[in-house]
Design a protein with these regions (language model features):
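Single conserved hydrophobic/aromatic residue that forms the stacking wall/gate
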Residues: 1-8, 13
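Conserved beta-strand-loop-beta-strand element in the redox core of flavoprotein oxidoreductases
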Residues: 9, 124-157
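Cofactor-binding loop segments of dinucleotide-utilizing enzymes, especially the Rossmann-like FAD-
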Residues: 13, 65, 88-91, 211
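FAD-site-proximal beta/loop scaffold in flavoenzymes
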Residues: 26-57, 142-216
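Rossmann-like NAD(P)H-binding beta-loop-alpha module
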Residues: 45-80
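A conserved FAD-binding loop/helix module that cradles the flavin
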Residues: 72, 212-238
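Rossmann-like dinucleotide-binding cores of NAD(P)H-dependent redox enzymes
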Residues: 73-120
Length: 239
C-alpha cells in the first residue's frame, strides 16, 4: 500500500505560462516561450513538413530577460530570424539570465531593447501580429525583489515592426494540483508550502518539490528537491 506521495507541477499538466494581459496577445504569431520551445524541440515544428510547423518569423521579439527568453531568442535566430530582439523592462544589469547566456545571445546577433515594455500588439487584416507598441521605461526605487522598479516614461511610446512575438515572463504553478489535495498550505503565489528540510507539506503524507514549491527554478534544484523528499519518504515509511 502506498502511504506517501510526491507532488511536482510536471505530474500531469505543465505550469501555466504567464502573459501580460495586454491588447493583441491573441493574435496569430504571439505565443509563450513554453509553447515555442516545446514545439521546436519535441515536435519537430521547425520542419515545414511536420504536422504542426511553427511560424518562423523574420522579425522576432522575445519578451523577458531570463534564461528561457535567451533560449527562445537564440532559437529564433537559428531558425532564420533576420532581426531577433530581447525586450526587457529593466536594464541589462537587472536581467535574471546567466551572464554567459546573454553573451552567447549577443554573439549570435541578438538585439537587446532594455528599458522597454510592450503595451500592445497590432495585427493585420488576417489577424497576424505585425507591430508592437513599446513603452520606454526608467528605473526607480528597488521593489520587493530587490531590483530597481521600472517606471514608465510619460509619452515615450514607439512602434516596432514584428511578425512573431514570444512571451517569456515566467510561469505560475498549476492551480489544479493544490485543489486535488485538500488541506495543503498554499502561498500567495500559489506554490505549496513545505518544510525545506524534508519537503513535507502540511499534509503529513504529501511531499512536494520543484516549480510547485519554488515558483520557477532550474531542473537541478527540482532534482535536489526530489532526492530530499525521497529520502524523507523512505525514512517515514520505514517507521
Amino acid at each position: 500500500e502506498i502511504c506517501a506521495c510526491l507532488v511536482g507541477s510536471e505530474m500531469c499538466i505543465r505550469d501555466s505560462p504567464n502573459f501580460m494581459n495586454i491588447p493583441g496577445e491573441n493574435l496569430v504569431g504571439v505565443m509563450s516561450s513554453n509553447e515555442y520551445l516545446t514545439r521546436v524541440n519535441l515536435m519537430d515544428a521547425a520542419n515545414p513538413d511536420s504536422d504542426t510547423p511553427v511560424l518562423q518569423g523574420k522579425k522576432v521579439a522575445v519578451i523577458g530577460g531570463g534564461n528561457t527568453a535567451m533560449d527562445s531568442v537564440r532559437t529564433a535566430r537559428r531558425l532564420g530570424a533576420e532581426r531577433a530582439m530581447i525586450v526587457y523592462r529593466r536594464s541589462e544589469e537587472e536581467m535574471p539570465a546567466r551572464l554567459e547566456e546573454v553573451k552567447h545571445a549577443k554573439e549570435e546577433g541578438v538585439e537587446f531593447m532594455t528599458l522597454h515594455n510592450p503595451v500592445e500588439y497590432l495585427g493585420d487584416e488576417r489577424g497576424r501580429v505585425k507591430q508592437m507598441r513599446l513603452q520606454k521605461m526608467e528605473l526607480g526605487e528597488p521593489d520587493a525583489s530587490g531590483r530597481r522598479r521600472p517606471v514608465p516614461v510619460e509619452g515615450a511610446i514607439e512602434t516596432i515592426d514584428v511578425d512573431e512575438v514570444i512571451v517569456s515572463v515566467g510561469v505560475s504553478p498549476n492551480p489544479l494540483i493544490p485543489r486535488a489535495f485538500q488541506g495543503l498550505e498554499v502561498s500567495k503565489k500559489g506554490t505549496i508550502v513545505v518544510n525545506e528540510e524534508n519537503m513535507r507539506s502540511a499534509l503529513p503524507d504529501v511531499y512536494a518539490g520543484g516549480d510547485i514549491v519554488r515558483g520557477g527554478a532550474t531542473v537541478i534544484l527540482a532534482m535536489g528537491d526530489g532526492r530530499k523528499a525521497a529520502a524523507a519518504m523512505d525514512e517515514a515509511l520505514r517507521g
